[in-house]
């Protein structure tokens, strides 16, 4: 199977993860979602951190100077902080986010932008190695499900019907595949920039995990909830480690 075929397949799966998150909001009642989402967030946090520290950063450093990669990661984290302040990269995983009620169109734009970036990240990772592409796509999929559940809640709060909110989620998720294909052909001729794209991708994964997901997990402080979160976080990291050791 060619690299392009793998990029198309896993980008499609990334989009499917986004649609799946919205579909869960349609199928399951709120009581079930409130139990399911924290577990998904815990696992997604582990996969994002694992993909960044066990995959993207080591591979980027192998292909260029470590100091350049670490500087790029630092710049990326600051950049994503600014983008989130502008509510372009806003992540919300519950129904009580401060931007609910007025942010429907902005969430759709931000979600489409985020999914477009996911496509670029997946393509860049596969151009380095199949292992890196697979674990990157896995982290994207794991994070998309709880993110889209949160976005779905925002759209409902903004006055959209359930059917229209699902349709708009479907449209925004479709940005991943064309972005991946375009990036494949663009990056094939500019291989030197791929390590820096991986560094920025790692920065986004680290930022999402540390700034957006972990604070949500801290909202539940019981020993039982904390133990479940810790186990699922380790499971996410362990999944990436498994692929790393067996690729």
Please annotate each region the language model reported.
Residues 1-247:
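Intrinsically disordered, metal-sensing/regulatory segments
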